[in-house]
Amino acid sequence: MGFYSGYSGGYSGGGYGSSFVLIVVLFILLIIVGATFLY
């Protein structure tokens, strides 16, 4: 819920593009690092 409210707030604020891309990149990096430690 916190992510969704921040997502819609960024969208209406006009800063949707950069913040969303930043979140996606951080999420992908987190998955890669996690997979590296698991395997």
Swiss-Prot record:
Record keywords, A-Z: Membrane, Transmembrane, Transmembrane helix
Protein's membrane topology: Single-pass membrane protein
Subcellular location field: Membrane
Alphabetized Pfam families for the sequence: YjcZ_2
One Gene Ontology CC term in the entry: membrane
Keyword Transmembrane found: yes
Sequence intervals crossing the membrane: 19-39
InterPro entries with a match to the protein in the record: YjcZ-like
Disulphide bond pairs: none
Main location: membrane
Keyword Transmembrane: yes
Similarity remark: Belongs to the SscA family.
Protein name: SPbeta prophage-derived membrane protein YosA
